[in-house]
């Protein structure tokens, strides 16, 4: 599990991205790069690192499910992810 401070930082970054999304879009359309530079760095969505929604793990993230491979495997074995079942042939 990730440190609680890293999870909190990630959530704070997500809020900043949402807060400035409309303003960033407008400034980009105008071509006002000077004003874009004055916005907070963390308001840029490119700086976000995808993290597991359950425990905050940053590596082995599965975008389709919003979780890491470890949590995906555990939940899939328990049958808690709809439409996912263990393969057998």
Curated annotation (Swiss-Prot):
Keywords associated with the record: Ribonucleoprotein, Ribosomal protein, RNA-binding, rRNA-binding
Record-level GO BP terms: translation
Listed Gene3D superfamilies: 30s Ribosomal Protein S14, Chain N
Short name of any one Pfam family annotated for the protein: Ribosomal_S14
One GO CC annotation: small ribosomal subunit
InterPro entries (UniProt xref): Ribosomal_uS14, Ribosomal_uS14_bac/plastid, Ribosomal_uS14_sf
GO molecular function terms listed in the Swiss-Prot or TrEMBL record: rRNA binding; structural constituent of ribosome
SUPFAM superfamilies: Glucocorticoid receptor-like (DNA-binding domain)
Presence of keyword Repeat: no
Coiled-coil boundaries: none
Complexes and interactors: Part of the 30S ribosomal subunit. Contacts proteins S3 and S10.
Role of this protein: Binds 16S rRNA, required for the assembly of 30S particles and may also be responsible for determining the conformation of the 16S rRNA at the A site.
Protein family membership: Belongs to the universal ribosomal protein uS14 family.
NCBIfam families hit by this protein: PRK08881.1
Name of protein: Small ribosomal subunit protein uS14A
Gene behind the chain: rpsN
């Amino acid at each position: 599990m990730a440190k609680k401070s890293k999870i909190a930082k990630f959530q704070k970054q997500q809020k900043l991205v949402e807060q400035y999304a409309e303003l960033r879009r407008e400034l980009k359309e105008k071509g006002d790069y000077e004003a874009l530079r004055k916005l907070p760095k963390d308001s840029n969505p490119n700086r976000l690192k995808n993290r597991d929604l359950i425990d905050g793990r940053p590596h082995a993230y599965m975008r389709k499910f919003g979780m890491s491979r470890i949590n995906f495997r555990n939940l899939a074995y328990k049958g808690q992810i709809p439409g996912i079942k263990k393969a057998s042939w």
